[in-house]
Amino acid sequence: MAASLVRSCCSRASRAITTVRFMSNVPEDTVYGGPKPQNSNQRVTLTQLRQKHRKGEPITMVTAYDYPSAVHIDTAGIDVCLVGDSAAMVVHGYDTTLPISLEEMLVHCRAVARGAKRPLLVGDLPFGTYESSTNQAVDTAVRVLKEGGMDAIKLEGGSPSRITAAKSIVEAGIAVMGHVGLTPQAISVLGGFRPQGKNIASAVKVVETAMALQEAGCFSVVLECVPPPVAAAATSALNIPTIGIGAGPFCSGQVLVYHDLLGMMQHPHHAKVTPKFCKQYAQVGEVINKALLEYKEEVSKHLFPGPSHSPYKISSSDLDGFLSELQKLGLDKAASDAAASAEKMDHSDSPSSQ
């Protein structure tokens, strides 16, 4: 009896140890200790971005503003999805990024969060929502995460107040991406959408600002529209990844605006041409225009919808009853038109008409 009990206890202990060993092979992703199974669709983390950076593997980032664009970015396996305030221009049609509000940005953030399950999600802090005080900056960042479903925020510029804002947001436990060089929210100071770092003082300022953002705790810095040597210097000087847009090939990663890289807006009213730094990987705008023109033509010529796109049927007996009810209501013409349409659809469906 005692020997049997010992064997039973040992057997249960062995199974328990086996279970523990098996589960310990799965990485623990939270401080609460719940081991999670590895999943190819698991959200990209800051740790993974740092690992890519250390290995010298380029980081990919693309903007998204709604559910469909987020799904496409998710499917492509892009590392980071930025809900940019560029939505003001490419979605809302403004000339600059300045008019978009926090409430509008939150709508975009929520839509993207529903569509992009894998990329790290970064939301821009729109102009006027973080400049007045550190409290305002932290409150806005909290809303972008809690209400927008983002994983991190991005803010522009490197003035002392922006550096302080970045530091305060990081201290509040929120990951921050910085942005230097051409900062669209500062176009009134910069004199328009102009490249930065083209002279000694400006180039040094780009590098120093990027370093200050790193010191403030930013996990990454966007370098926009600066000469490649300046971007290379900033990338070398930093321990965090740089993400270039119009900054040459020497950054830790690259970002482009969704609409620009897909060629969706051949003649945007806010720019004479697509930005010089942007490669168009498709001409989606032409495809859209062609499809819309074809649709318009087919509807105008009564070619759409045809039988193949009119799938819902009514039985002959129900049709007869329906026509009878129309006649009782005094809708003789409606009954006649309904009967004629049914006859026409039957003729279209017959083998001889195929």
Curated annotation (Swiss-Prot):
GO terms for cellular component: mitochondrion. It is an enzyme of class 2 (transferase). It comes from the Eukaryota. Pathway: Cofactor biosynthesis; (R)-pantothenate biosynthesis; (R)-pantoate from 3-methyl-2-oxobutanoate: step 1/2. Its main location: mitochondrion. The active site is at E224. Its cofactor is Mg(2+). Mg(2+) binds at D85, D124, E156. Keywords: Magnesium, Metal-binding, Mitochondrion, Pantothenate biosynthesis, Transferase, Transit peptide. One of its GO terms (biological process) is pantothenate biosynthetic process. Binds 1 Mg(2+) ion per subunit. NCBIfam families: panB (TIGR00222), PRK00311.1 (NF001452). Belongs to the PanB family. This is 3-methyl-2-oxobutanoate hydroxymethyltransferase 2, mitochondrial. The lineage of its organism: Eukaryota, Viridiplantae, Streptophyta, Embryophyta, Tracheophyta.
